[in-house]
């Protein structure tokens, strides 16, 4: 009887793990927080591994276990507490509660000495209410500014409700170069019909910020997202959004974006609440 009870407990609660060597996938990007010298001037040990890269690592156990049930019908709230640096080992732990409705997964990305550098709570097969069901009419399209005409962000400019210029990107899958940079080996992203990687989608949240404003070094700190459908080779994604909030905390200037990713057929792909420090305090 005790053995049977233990077996049931193991079925409804499981721990999935994944190890990977962190890579600074944006060392040459416009955002110089990923550059060793610039990051050091802000008090870091080197260029920061991008938050979207850490997020990609954190999705591996949940996608390996649940596949499309998460990629097309799941959510995640992820926060980045401390940076990873290039070459460090990342241990991802995903504690799955199969008894919850919807299924819940508590995820940590641990670095040196077991420190949780990032944490997340995910749900599977979830049409969660915490972000609300998106309506296309709430996310109007708008033109992007010219690269050379992008304004420098400020609290006076980043007013809640301000509409962002729409970013449109075609998809060509599988993106083998990106998968190699992430050391990603799950066949769902490489075998036909390949689906877009979570890294690809959340990277668009960064890109719409960069294409709307002329930024100095900046830091992605958190994202709350819910997946509504997958997107595949040949589709075109438009990223629409607005400013949700702008505030100062401990000398850092933050911006919060409310974004909707839409396929060319009008299908909602993902809604994202994306949070970044657009102007870090100087050390």
Language-model regions, residue ranges each:
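Hydrophobic beta-strand-centered segment that forms part of the acyl-chain substrate-binding groove
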Residues: 53-96, 100, 119, 198-243, ...
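HotDog/MaoC-like acyl-thioester-processing domains
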Residues: 3-20, 82-155, 227-283
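Hot-dog-fold acyl-thioester-processing enzymes
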Residues: 3, 8-73, 129-222, 283
